[in-house]
UniProtKB/Swiss-Prot annotation:
Domain YcgL: 1-85
Gene3D superfamilies linked: YcgL domain
Identification of the protein by name: YcgL domain-containing protein Smlt4554
Pfam families hit by this protein: YcgL
Annotated InterPro entries: YcgL-like_sf (IPR038068), YcgL_dom (IPR027354)
Origin: domain of life: Bacteria
Length: 86
């Protein structure tokens, strides 16, 4: 699986992983609005050997398959998020 990673310009240390470059159609409108402009930062192959600095590759692959995106937020923010966003 391949991922394209974008950085939020409004939310510090917040990134969105999507399976197709520049395709944000799977992101809910309120989330997309709250993130503001998204700046492309990386494309990455999420194979079994891939390690990511701040995210679990299995969770990234799972969310991208099931939801169409993966949202990476700073640990301090993640602890405050409702359970259904895990």
């Amino acid at each position: 699986m391949h991922a394209y990673v974008y950085k939020s310009q409004l939310k510090p240390d917040t990134y969105v992983y999507v399976p197709r470059r520049d395709d944000f159609s799977a992101l809910p409108a309120p989330l997309l609005t709250s993130l503001g402009a998204l700046t492309f930062v990386l494309d990455v192959a999420l194979d079994a050997q891939r390690r990511l600095a701040q995210a679990d590759p299995d969770k990234v692959r799972s969310d991208m398959s099931e939801r169409g995106f993966y949202l990476q937020v700073p640990p301090s923010v993640a602890s405050l998020m409702p359970r259904h966003y895990d």
